[in-house]
A protein has these predicted regions:
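Long, repeat-rich segments with strong aromatic
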Residues: 196-198
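Amphipathic coiled-coil/heptad-repeat helices and related helical stalk/stem segments
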Residues: 176-180, 203, 323
């Protein structure tokens, strides 16, 4: 009916998308869909010339081959090396008629918005925010992905809507964690975090500091995220913070924090170094929204109670009888290319 549709999707260095239906979308809209394939190839060339020396200040975990990271005297590493496959265009937002913005953690997929994965989104009716989302989109559409985008460290994109103060920050050039830290540091009573990946060192330290000054901190982390060799969820546990690993077949895919039941951090960015410094992301910081904060707190409580307390101390396996429905859902929940009863953990 005449609506102009443009889009940007993520591709890796093999010119492949995570979703197999992406080529269909590209075929329908032809030149209106663009991607970061060429940029990732250029980045690969640059990275191939760099030499990396291993940090020897901590002990490497057994049976690991990935880059060694030292944090608080402990070594972290992935089981397998991970060659560069491309930075990620990880945004999930729509701008409609320069007025409305739909954004959050949900991929437009059967599992992402079909109720299987845990996600949340925000809908903004605001020409102000639509303008800045459009500026970000135009950068991506013109080929300025990831580290090529304009630096926006000191850019303040904020507006009061009703009683809430809303701020917007884009990664990787907006230095998102610098905007998130003050809210965590100012927390007085509670911090609830439902999240997919939590590997960021500095934010992990800030959560422990909050716990030590009496703030009640709770974290729900995805099973796959917990299996990541750089995950800091056990560090949080070791320092007294309650962390539950979800035992659902679907993913805990949110990237959210609710502070004092009235401040909300929500968006596409996982709390990881890559999320902050490499991937294209957007994050909304919503302050003083007691109604939405209470709504999200209640939702978090429901999720928290749905996970047995057993998983406060142990980690579930994403594709196993630990995780409800994961052995019968037809999905490769742990990304090992083995589905349901073809995975030994489901036998």
């Amino acid at each position: 009916r005449g609506v102009e549709i443009r889009g940007v999707v993520d591709k890796d260095i093999d010119n492949k998308s995570y979703y197999r239906d992406t080529p269909k979308l590209e075929k329908i809209f032809k030149a209106k869909i663009r991607d970061d394939f060429k940029y990732d190839l250029e980045t690969k060339k640059i990275l191939s010339k760099k030499k990396y020396s291993e940090n020897n200040k901590c002990q490497r975990p057994e049976d690991t081959e990935g880059p060694l990271q030292c944090f608080e005297g402990k070594g972290y590493a992935s089981k397998n090396p991970f060659p560069f496959k491309g930075d990620i265009m990880h945004n999930k937002f729509f701008i409609i008629d320069n007025q409305y913005v739909w954004t959050g953690s949900a991929n437009i997929s059967d599992t992402g918005i079909g109720g299987y994965n845990a996600n949340n989104v925000v809908v903004l009716d605001s020409k102000f925010f639509a303008k800045y989302y459009l500026e970000e989109f135009e950068q991506l559409y013109s080929g300025k992905f990831h580290r090529r985008k304009a630096v926006a460290r000191h850019k303040d994109i904020s507006k009061k809507i009703d009683s809430a103060n809303i701020s917007l920050v884009f990664s990787p050039k907006g230095y998102a964690m610098e905007k998130i830290f003050p809210i965590i540091k100012d927390a007085k009573q509670s911090i609830d975090i439902p999240i997919f990946f939590l590997t960021h060192n500095a934010v992990s330290k800030e959560l422990v500091k909050a716990h030590n000054r009496g703030v009640v901190v709770r974290v729900i982390i995805d099973s796959t995220g917990a299996s990541n060799g750089y995950s800091k969820h056990q560090y949080l546990r070791d320092n007294g913070i309650k962390v539950k690993v979800e035992n659902w077949g679907g993913k805990m895919h949110m990237k959210t924090a609710i502070i004092d039941q009235k401040h909300i951090i929500i968006g596409s960015m996982n709390w990881t170094k890559a999320g902050v410094t490499k991937n294209d992301e957007n994050t909304l910081i919503i302050k003083n929204s007691s109604s939405k904060g209470l709504q999200l707190t209640n939702f978090f409580n429901d999720m928290w109670l749905s996970i047995p307390d057993k998983w406060l101390d142990e980690d579930t396996k994403a594709e196993s009888h630990d995780s409800i429905n994961s052995c019968t859902d037809g999905i490769d929940n742990d990304f090992d290319k083995l589905i349901d009863n073809k995975d030994i953990k489901c036998l």
